């Protein structure tokens, strides 16, 4: 079980790394736009424009390549830390009830799930950043065209047009394009990918441990500011494998009620909720 506060801050180191990449990319783009000052409105415009767009694309690819190794190492470190923390918290519950779960480090099933979670999260990261070069170069190209059009119209001088283009990119620059067409900054995309990967992997480990220990009931965590669809089921108790009435209490079906296993549900996209094992017949879990 991972606390919401832990999940909220888990991606911080990785996000900082990609914030630095964002800053480097924006500085490079601004520098290239400023070179418009040395040109006449029509002198070799198309050739220069093409060369600059290609240069931006290549520079972005190089910057991302330098960052990828650091990112993969941080993802692996974070996944190991989060998985260990989740299992320690979950196993405390089992020990409280006199049960003996196998050590996490010695459990081949759990270790395989952890490795699969790392591979999936790293793969998601690669997919997100794979579009960055084209996304950035496309925005750079559009900014050049807008600035060039302003100058040619006679309404702006080069200095004003360049400043406007740079300021606009600084305020609205996007780096990642999803298949749906939605765009994000690298910071937002990285945080979402890591948070989702860490929480989903921890959840799969907890489900596997529950299978091992014969657990039938789960309770979800709760935190302030939950999205309305999640507030409906946070802090409640559920039964795995269908709704039941047990010891005078109704327990809704875990997956059906929480949407666990779907992107929009428990432990889905950007979700900071998780769950833990309970044994209604044995009393409340440890605080």
Residue ranges and their predicted role:
Residues 184-284:
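Acidic, glycine-rich two-metal-ion catalytic cores of nucleic acid-processing enzymes
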